[in-house]
């Protein structure tokens, strides 16, 4: 249930206005102009004053019994539904749901242009227009913060860092040796620009390699909570536009991640590897160092990648192999275990 402590309901909204707002509706249904929607709820909890959505077929059975006044469904949905529920067919029902959330809700907590008294901002730092700098934020010399940005409490922005317009840096984020584009969202506890894990070993002693690279992050990138991104030792660590990086991800020094790629929680990418454009790495995936993962590659959860992968391949397992080979290996292993157990019983 949505809590009014944190989010403000902007409704009610007329159903006709909702359909007009969503734009990508296929053959908009004819609805009475007086139908009013008060809230968004899941199918199981929706009442006759609510709108719901269906994007995962696993929940389609609830469409038969839901009390929702309307439901956004995929354009090719052919299942059964409550005859009293208006079906709104969308090109992408989950995307439409995301737009609907923005239409109905806004966070209670808001920020206005202000630098809190407890913040420490160097005289040589440049803070753009309409920025909010929270309690106990530290901004060092020669930092540039773009217009309309928010730096929340306890964050540290190191010397010379450049952050673009409309950035949101949540609490207790640390950023050093970094250049960050516009529209960045960096969630609480992320660490960006620290030295990578690089050593030279001489006579049994591991000597630290001084890192002289930086982290370059493109436009419209999201970095999850407690994710760590090391700066390069010689070549820069680069994250291109439109990337989405989940919580608790480790990105090693000199890694390059291509435009639009998605990295799910607890994944780790070792130094100097390249991830192509629009790749997807599942949870707990590990990528060894100095590899080239080409555009459009998908790696299933817990996959361990030890060699280069060609474009648009789907792999899984550890060591990672083509996904169908991995499934076959799993089936064969299961059969071998059954056979072995039956022999032991005899």
Swiss-Prot record:
What reaction does this enzyme carry out catalytically?
A: a UDP-3-O-[(3R)-3-hydroxyacyl]-alpha-D-glucosamine + a (3R)-hydroxyacyl-[ACP] = a UDP-2-N,3-O-bis[(3R)-3-hydroxyacyl]-alpha-D-glucosamine + holo-[ACP] + H(+)
Q: Which domain of life is it from?
A: Bacteria
Q: What InterPro entries does the database record attribute to this sequence?
A: Hexapep (IPR001451), Hexapep_transf_CS (IPR018357), LpxD (IPR007691), Trimer_LpxA-like_sf (IPR011004), UDP_GlcNAc_AcTrfase_non-rep (IPR020573)
**UniProt xrefs under Pfam families:** Hexapep, LpxD
Q: Where is the active site?
A: 253 (proton acceptor)
This entry's Enzyme Commission designation comes to 2.3.1.191
Identify the keywords attached in UniProt to this record, alphabetized: Acyltransferase, Lipid A biosynthesis, Lipid biosynthesis, Lipid metabolism, Repeat, Transferase
Its GO CC terms?
Answer: membrane
Q: Which Gene3D superfamilies match?
A: Hexapeptide repeat proteins (2.160.10.10), MurE/MurF, N-terminal domain (3.40.1390.10)
Q: What's a BP term from Gene Ontology annotated to this protein?
A: lipid A biosynthetic process
According to the UniProt entry, its GO molecular function terms are: N-acyltransferase activity
The annotated pathway is: Bacterial outer membrane biogenesis; LPS lipid A biosynthesis
Recorded family membership: Belongs to the transferase hexapeptide repeat family. LpxD subfamily.
Sum up the protein's function in the record's words.
Catalyzes the N-acylation of UDP-3-O-acylglucosamine using 3-hydroxyacyl-ACP as the acyl donor. Is involved in the biosynthesis of lipid A, a phosphorylated glycolipid that anchors the lipopolysaccharide to the outer membrane of the cell.
* Record text on subunit structure and interactions: Homotrimer.
Any idea what this protein is called? UDP-3-O-acylglucosamine N-acyltransferase
């Amino acid at each position: 249930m949505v809590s009014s402590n944190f989010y403000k309901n902007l409704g009610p909204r007329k159903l006709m206005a909702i359909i007009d707002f969503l734009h990508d509706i296929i053959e908009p249904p004819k609805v009475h102009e007086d139908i009013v929607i008060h809230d968004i709820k899941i199918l199981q909890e929706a009442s006759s004053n609510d709108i719901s959505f269906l994007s995962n077929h696993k929940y389609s059975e609830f469409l038969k019994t839901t009390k929702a006044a309307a439901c956004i469904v995929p354009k090719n949905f052919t299942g059964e539904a409550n005859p009293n529920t208006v079906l709104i067919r969308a090109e992408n029902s989950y995307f439409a749901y995301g737009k609907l959330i923005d239409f109905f809700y806004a966070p209670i907590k808001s920020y206005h242009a202000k630098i809190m008294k407890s913040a420490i901002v160097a005289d040589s730092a440049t803070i753009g227009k309409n920025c909010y700098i929270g309690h106990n934020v530290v901004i060092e010399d020669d930092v540039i913060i773009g217009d309309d940005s928010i730096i929340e409490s306890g964050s540290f922005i190191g010397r010379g860092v450049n952050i673009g317009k409309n950035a949101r840096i949540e609490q207790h984020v640390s950023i050093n040796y970094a250049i960050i584009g516009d529209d960045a969202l960096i969630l609480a506890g992320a660490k960006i620009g620290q030295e990578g894990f690089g050593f030279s070993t001489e006579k049994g002693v591991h000597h630290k390699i001084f890192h002289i690279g930086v982290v370059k992050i493109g436009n419209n990138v999201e970095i999850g909570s407690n994710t760590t991104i090391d700066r390069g030792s010689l070549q820069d660590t680069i994250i291109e536009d439109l990337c989405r990086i989940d919580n608790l991800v480790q990105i090693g020094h000199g890694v390059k991640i291509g435009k639009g790629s998605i990295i799910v929680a607890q994944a780790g990418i070792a130094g100097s590897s390249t991830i192509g454009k629009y790749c997807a790495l599942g949870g707990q995936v590990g990528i060894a160092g100095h590899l080239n993962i080409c555009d459009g590659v998908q790696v299933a959860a817990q996959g361990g990648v030890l060699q280069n992968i060609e474009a648009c391949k789907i792999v899984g397992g550890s060591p990672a192999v083509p996904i169908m080979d991995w499934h076959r290996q799993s089936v064969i292993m299961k059969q071998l275990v059954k056979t072995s157990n039956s022999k032991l019983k005899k």
